[in-house]
Each structure stands twice: as structure tokens, then as C-alpha cells.
């Protein structure tokens, strides 16, 4: 199995004028560790930057998400910290993939899936801008899940 190493350079601490907007346009680097340290909410992704028509989001996760499906788009996961399982349901049946730190996985469009983090973990997601975190179809949304298209970094 091949793993993707992710190393983020720290943002310039002396540049108080840096905003999410300028960072999102590629003017300044964004340290993923700083982005993740800027919020505490679980299952509530923050938009780190945009690439063409895609959001690059980070989220802190723990426990179970909910079964959901994105009918028209794949969903890319990269585990930044911790370990995440993704339960999958499709025509072939049900299975679970385990993603240790540094692993990537793409859930194909139309595949029901449910991320699960048995301990605290952090993930990075690539999704088309405006994609709802709970997909197009989903089970009942628990109170701890933020149904959103992503929040701006603080």
C-alpha cells in the first residue's frame, strides 16, 4: 500500500494582513496544523482553499458520521491525523476500508458511505464547491453533525 506524506510549512506569523481570501488565492501558504487548530467542532469542515471549482476542506472527526451518498460526485479523503474507517454500501454489498494517517481514499459517486473515527482524527476532503456534507440522500442527521457546504476558516 502506498501512502501520501503530507508536510505543511507554517504560515508567516509576522504577516497580520493575511486573510482566508488571500490565502485561498495562493498568495500565502496555509499550514494545515494552524487551520485545524483554529476550530474545535467535530464533523464541521472548514474550507482551507479552493482549486478550480473544488473546495479543499479540513475537519476534525470522532465517533460515527451518518450513512449518506453523493449522487453526482466522488468524495476524496486524506487522513491527516489519527485513523478513519469508511463503511461502504454498493451493489457488491457492504465493506469497510481502514485509513491510517497519510492514507487517501476516494468514495465513488453513488456509493453510500459512513466515516467512522474510533478516536480523534483529522481529515482533508476534496469536493466540488457547494457540495453538502451530508450528501444528496442520507439517514436522519444527528445533532452533532453539521450539515453544511463548509465554513470559512476563522
What are these model-derived regions, one by one?
Residues 60-61, 70-86, 90, 126:
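Short, conserved beta-strand element in jelly-roll/cupin
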Residues 2-7, 14-57, 140-154:
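A short, N-terminal "cap"/entry segment at the start of jelly-roll beta-barrel domains
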Residues 52, 80-81, 100-101, 119:
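A cytosolic small-molecule/anion-sensing beta-strand core signal
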Residues 109-139:
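Ligand-binding loop in jelly-roll beta-barrel domains
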Residues 38, 47-51, 67-70, 76-78:
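Short secondary-structure boundary/capping segments within folded domains
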Residues 47-48, 59, 66-71, 87-89, ...:
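Short histidine-centered beta-strand/loop micro-motifs
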Residues 91-109:
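Short acidic-glycine-tyrosine-enriched beta hairpin
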Amino acid at each position: 500500500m502506498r501512502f501520501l506524506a503530507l508536510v505543511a510549512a507554517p504560515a508567516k506569523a509576522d504577516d497580520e494582513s493575511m486573510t482566508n481570501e488571500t490565502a485561498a488565492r495562493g498568495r500565502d501558504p496555509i499550514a494545515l496544523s494552524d487551520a485545524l487548530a483554529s476550530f474545535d467542532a467535530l464533523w464541521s469542515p472548514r474550507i482551507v482553499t479552493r482549486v478550480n471549482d473544488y473546495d479543499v476542506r479540513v475537519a476534525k472527526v470522532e465517533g460515527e458520521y451518518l450513512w449518506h451518498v453523493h449522487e453526482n460526485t466522488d468524495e476524496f479523503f486524506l487522513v491527516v491525523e489519527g485513523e478513519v474507517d469508511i463503511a461502504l454500501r454498493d451493489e457488491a454489498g457492504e465493506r469497510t476500508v481502514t485509513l491510517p494517517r497519510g492514507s487517501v481514499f476516494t468514495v465513488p459517486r453513488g456509493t453510500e458511505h459512513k466515516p467512522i473515527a474510533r478516536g480523534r482524527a483529522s481529515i482533508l476532503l476534496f469536493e466540488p464547491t457547494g457540495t453538502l456534507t451530508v450528501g444528496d440522500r442520507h439517514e436522519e442527521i444527528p445533532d452533532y453533525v453539521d450539515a453544511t457546504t463548509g465554513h470559512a476558516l476563522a
